[in-house]
Amino acid sequence: MSGGVDSSVALVLLKDKYEVSGYTLKLHDSRGTDDSGLCGSASDIEDAKAIAAKFGVPHYLLDMRDLFSDTVQKSFVQSYLSGRTPNPCVECNETIKFGALLDAVKKQGINHIATGHYVRSCYDEKSGRWLLKKAINADGTSNAKDQSYVLYRLSQQQLAASVFPLGEMTKDEIRHIAADSGLINSDKPDSQDICFVPDGDYAGFIERYTGNTYPDGDFLDENGNVIGRHKGVIFYTIGQRRGIGTGFGKPMYVIGKNADNNTVTLGSNELLFTDTLYADNLNWIAFEYPESEFKCKAKTRYRQTEQPCTVYPQGRNTVRVVFDEKIRAVTPGQHVVFLSLIHISEPTRH
């Protein structure tokens, strides 16, 4: 229970069918000010406690601040410092919410966890595997809140132990149930951006986490010529336009970063498009691994529309992905997720 409306409604939907307990994760230290923008904030914890109490459900608070800092936040910082652009929500789901939390509740005799994610899962008798499926609306149309992208790293064991009661519901339906149930958070805003960087200042978080500041360096053009100065590699990501300046005679975008040399390469928007990427650290869901090339759709960002592509296995842990049409701003450190009409399978962006 995050204290948000989605996990609260998941509780409402399940409490009369199962013996339910509520678990909330403490992931951050209070800053002594309003921390309502943080996932697992003091206000969120109080909301979760109140909702569990309303329905007579046992509530437990698990302190995972050290683990969260040493895994999710540390990996986020290291990725940025190496010039990559990570998605910490993916690692948090795999390592914390469906990892450490699941391990903790199993020790208390609980075999399944339910969350407020907008996603579906099912067991496929033919393959003998659990499948991860996109959220849909009641009429079968695509659900704009689908979160399958950030859950693609879940293992077969994690999927088998997970329940997703909101997989065929809209946000409006969720809020309606919450209001009818008298939940105090029925109109609570959705969380935005990375939960531990609610202000979107990634560079500021990295400086606070490491205790270091990071030097400015050279802007390069596509041919390696110095064309200006940047304020630090950690302030930029592939495809970025904002904050670069306008003194180059034409619109310029970040097309590359080199953390070792402390340089940021700029170029025109056209240079951001490619039809090929390579991915490793694979996590296949619908099968153990592909025997041969296959066609599907893929996305490299959470809010991106899936694009048709062909996936070419190169060994058991690397693939080459060729898109039917070029896509914009393929970024090292991001994740690529493969989808078909039947299932979702996936590797991590290399």
Question: Whereabouts are the PLM-identified features?
Answer:
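Short, glycine-/aromatic-enriched active-site segment of Class I SAM-dependent methyltransferases
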Residues: 160
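Basic, glycine-rich polyanion-binding accessory segments appended to enzymes
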Residues: 250, 258-340
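Short, glycine- and charge-enriched coil/turn segments that flank and shape catalytic ligand pockets
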Residues: 34-36, 108, 122-131, 209-214, ...
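ATP-dependent adenylation/nucleotidyltransferase module used to activate substrates
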Residues: 1-153, 163, 172-173, 179, ...
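Anionic-ligand-binding alpha/beta catalytic cores of soluble enzymes and soluble regulatory domains
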Residues: 177-283
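Conserved small/polar residues in nucleotide/adenosyl-binding loops
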Residues: 342-349
